[in-house]
From Swiss-Prot:
Source organism, top-level taxon: Bacteria
Principal location: cytoplasm
PANTHER family: ELONGATION FACTOR P, ELONGATION FACTOR P (EF-P) FAMILY PROTEIN
Record bears the keyword Cytoplasm: yes
Intracellular or extracellular location(s): Cytoplasm
Record-given protein name: Elongation factor P
Family: Belongs to the elongation factor P family.
UniProt keyword annotations, A-Z: Cytoplasm, Elongation factor, Protein biosynthesis
Database matches in SMART domains: EFP, Elong-fact-P_C
Amino acid sequence: MISVNDFRTGLTISVDNALWQVMDFQHVKPGKGAAFVRSKLRNLRTGSVQEKTFRAGEKVEKAHIENRRMQYLYASGESHVFMDNETYEQIELGENQIERELKFLKENMGVSIMTYQDEVLGVELPNTVELTVSETEPGIKGDTASNVTKPAKLETGLVVQVPIFINEGEMLIINTGEGKYVSRA
């Protein structure tokens, strides 16, 4: 058990038979009445975000999430196969479980799989990934004075806005949190 006064961003708790990750919190001490903690929580199973208020000093159960280093091997129909780097055990995750992460996954890529009591909760990607441009309009020589962007389709099917000087076949560094172009690789 952990007191809500000890909340911090990223903490995982179990409330009402659901697993929640603390996204944001604020200790509030009104002039009249008891202090409380206002929090913004994300459900780890469904991905939904909810605001919840706790009385100051209230206790909640801390959930121990295990992060296992794994390697993305391949897609097999609707499922995707990952291998544990230590035990070589393979697990399959459905497209519905990793829908957002699919746009960034490449074969043999290292990821972290979040588990709670042997239940897979999701895939944690690295902060940035290197992806190759598969389709984009050719850049126009000399048009570099302004901050002009164009859409580029990457090898995984993700479409990002890139500077006009980027051409097909180039490797780019993409921020996985925002899904945006960072720089050339």
